[in-house]
């Protein structure tokens, strides 16, 4: 079957079938969606604050797509089709090599946690943005929020139970990309570990940064805080080994203002029920904790995989959700503007591709921190930040794209969160 699909796609590429774009008013677009049986799009545009919609057609097929479309099918000649699970993967080139189709990056554990999150969404009756918007406007969003939180808490409780059952585990290593929710998860897991009779000690790996003057620099001469060598690996292993052997250790504190390591009398000595919960982007990299016995470590990977789609034909990129999370967080806790966050995001993403994603399948357990309703909450905080970016600034187009994306969602005031 897949060979026939690929043959047909290649035939369409050879024919260079044009893709037409036309702008229609929203009322007409909704009528056409209903005509085509696309009720998800009809419901979606009930909440869009736009007067016109761009529709695209290929032959007799007409649809709406979030993002830009090419002129004709001849531009789509580079692709790969691979059977996977109960479906298939459509593999496209990456921006850095537009004429090369990379091998399919199969990540079974990531795929399974995505499927789990989709099941949670189906359990709540929410699989698209339209489903979410309808729940919000009908006023029964709070129950759905409580269910979403409860499902996550059940998962965290099960992870804590797994750790408690492994009597040899002394180090819980938590890793994940930027704004995936590592710190929040670390705190929630610590509560569940306490409920199992353990004494958790949350430790941020950021406190093991080398002094700023010793931080490696990237290809542009800028400090590379996201490479493994930005951490004092020798000191970390020395401290953790001493703790494992029952010695009393003073843990460091990294002062981000001075860029130097400090000691503030934070002493720890591990007893039988003590567990160290280490959180940082390199937590799953074996080079980070090379001296610690394998049986003493339990690895957890945190992702933020959005479990709903814009509609049946348009997905929500996971990176968009994390970027919006980071924008709001940086503004509230680090006095960083949305403009600055957007400007540094490509560098953050490069660091993730290099240092984090290659290690994700090493996890003993994966946890998806994304909540089905979170973009509706973040919308009210992110939009004012994005509107501060002026036309003509390098980050304006990205800000405009994110504003368009957030416009799909009906906002939820913070006071409505249980």
Spans of model-derived segments:
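Auxiliary tRNA-acceptor-end handling modules of aminoacyl-tRNA synthetases
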Residues: 1-154, 159, 166
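Conserved NTP phosphate-binding and transfer environment spanning the P-loop NTPase/kinase superfamily
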Residues: 167, 286-418
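Hydrophobic anchor at the beta1->P-loop junction of P-loop NTPases
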Residues: 172-174
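Conserved glycine(s) of the Walker
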Residues: 181
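Hydrophobic positions on the alpha1 helix immediately C-terminal to the Walker A/P-loop
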Residues: 184-189, 204
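Post-Walker A helix-loop "phosphate-sensing" segment adjacent to the P-loop in P-loop NTPases
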Residues: 191-201
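Conserved nucleotide-sensing/catalytic segment adjacent to the nucleotide-binding pocket
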Residues: 201-203, 210-258, 275
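Glycine-rich phosphate-binding loop used to anchor ATP phosphates in small-molecule kinases
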Residues: 237-295, 342-359
């Amino acid at each position: 079957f897949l060979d026939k699909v690929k043959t047909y796609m290649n035939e369409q590429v050879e024919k260079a079938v044009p893709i037409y774009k036309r702008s229609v008013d929203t009322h007409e677009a909704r009528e056409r969606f209903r005509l085509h049986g696309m009720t998800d799009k009809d419901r979606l545009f009930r909440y869009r604050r736009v007067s016109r919609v761009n529709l695209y057609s290929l032959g007799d097929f007409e649809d709406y797509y979030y993002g830009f479309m090419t002129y004709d099918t001849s531009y789509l000649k580079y692709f790969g089709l691979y059977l996977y699970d109960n479906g298939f993967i459509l593999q496209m080139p990456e921006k850095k090599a537009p004429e090369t189709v990379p091998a399919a990056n199969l990540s079974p554990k990531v795929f399974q946690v995505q499927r789990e999150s989709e099941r949670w969404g189906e359990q709540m009756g929410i699989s698209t943005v339209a489903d979410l918007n309808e729940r919000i406007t009908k006023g029964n969003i709070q129950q759905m929020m409580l269910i979403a939180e409860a499902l996550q808490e059940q998962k965290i409780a099960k992870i804590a139970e797994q750790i408690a059952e492994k009597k040899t585990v002394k180090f819980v290593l938590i890793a994940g990309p930027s704004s995936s929710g590592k710190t929040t998860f670390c705190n929630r897991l610590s509560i569940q570990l306490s409920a199992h009779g353990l004494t958790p000690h949350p430790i941020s790996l950021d406190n093991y940064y080398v002094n700023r003057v010793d931080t490696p620099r990237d290809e542009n001469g800028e400090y590379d805080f996201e490479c493994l060598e930005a951490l004092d690996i020798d000191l970390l292993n020395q401290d953790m080994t001493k703790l494992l052997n029952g010695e009393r250790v003073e843990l460091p504190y990294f002062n981000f203002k001075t860029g130097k390591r400090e000691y503030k009398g934070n002493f720890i000595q591990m007893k039988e029920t003590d567990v160290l919960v280490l959180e940082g982007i390199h937590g799953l990299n074996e080079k980070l904790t090379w001296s610690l016995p394998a049986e003493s470590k339990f690895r957890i990977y945190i992702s933020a995989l959005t479990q709903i789609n814009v509609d049946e034909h348009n997905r929500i990129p996971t990176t968009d959700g994390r970027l919006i999370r980071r924008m709001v967080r940086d503004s509230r806790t680090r006095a960083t503007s949305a403009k600055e966050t957007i400007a540094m995001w490509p560098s953050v993403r490069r660091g993730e591709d290099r240092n984090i994603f290659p290690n994700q399948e090493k996890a003993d357990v994966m946890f998806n921190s994304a909540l089905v309703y979170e973009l509706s909450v973040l919308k009210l905080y992110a939009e004012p930040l994005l509107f501060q970016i002026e036309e003509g600034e390098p980050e304006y187009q990205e800000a405009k794209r994110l504003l368009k994306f957030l416009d799909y969602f009906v906002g939820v005031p913070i006071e409505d969160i249980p």
